[in-house]
Amino acid sequence: MNIRTASFTFIVVMMILSQTMADRFFNEPEEDDHLVESWNPFKKIAHRHCYPKNECITTNGKKTCKDYSCCQIVLFGKKTRSACTVVAQ
């Protein structure tokens, strides 16, 4: 095997492995707490970004508000969709 074939094989294998790891983060945002914690030394590569969100609805002159806590995973600078949970009504 010459150097070009070895380099090409290495690049293909690295792309497959990185896609497999990224797929875990992007498809399972609710169940990945243990994965993010295991990546703590690599916070610049993968970390969780949480922020508060407030949503108010006015119905028949009565205003009701809900507070949410929304979190998303940032992996290599790309953000996943937010998963929000109700904190208070």
Swiss-Prot record:
It comes from the Eukaryota. Contains 3 disulfide bonds. Keywords: Antibiotic, Antimicrobial, Bromination, Disulfide bond, Fungicide, Signal. The keyword Disulfide bond applies. Residues 23-38 form a propeptide. Residues 1-22 form the signal peptide. GO terms for biological process: defense response to bacterium; defense response to fungus; killing of cells of another organism. The modification 6'-bromotryptophan is found at residue 39. Has antimicrobial activity against Gram-negative bacteria and Gram-positive bacteria with minimum inhibitory concentration (MIC) between 0.78 uM and 3.13 uM. This is Strongylocin 2. It comes from Echinus esculentus (Sea urchin).
